[in-house]
Design a protein with these regions (language model features):
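C-terminal and inter-domain tail/linker signature
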Residues: 1-126
């Protein structure tokens, strides 16, 4: 049985994220080997990743796919992630995903985390 092409798997994963179907999104991630890395967090569990990303669901408007590059098992997407938040209404993101045997085993997201960090890190009071 042939596995789907890496680009198809990653596209389906992004479709599931955009549709806020996190249960379906989980089916595209490897059960035995998964790692996620971004400027604001990293994790090594697909279940933890889905639990975390599902919290973003309420503010996600759409994922604009600007350009896709494929090299073997690696899929690189240039994305604009649109949210309902004024300060983060369109975040340009580079996402690199590795697909093995039809499952995503690694995702690295690269973006300017300045506004995210302002929400996470408390500001010092003068």
């Amino acid at each position: 049985m042939n596995s789907p092409a890496p680009e198809e798997v990653v596209s389906a994963l992004l479709d599931a994220f955009e549709g806020r179907d996190f249960e379906r999104a989980r089916t595209y991630l490897s059960d035995s080997e998964f790692i996620y890395q971004s400027p604001i967090e990293s994790m090594s569990s697909a279940d933890d990743f889905i639990a975390n990303i599902s919290r973003v669901g309420p503010i996600l408007e759409r994922i604009e796919r600007v350009k896709t590059f494929v090299s073997g098992n690696d899929v690189c997407n240039l994305l604009r992630v649109h949210t309902t938040m004024d300060t983060l209404n369109a975040t340009t993101t580079v996402q690199i995903a590795t697909v093995v045997a039809g499952k995503v085993t690694a995702i690295e997201s690269i973006f300017d985390a300045t506004e995210y960090n302002k929400m996470i890190v408390p500001h010092e009071q003068d």
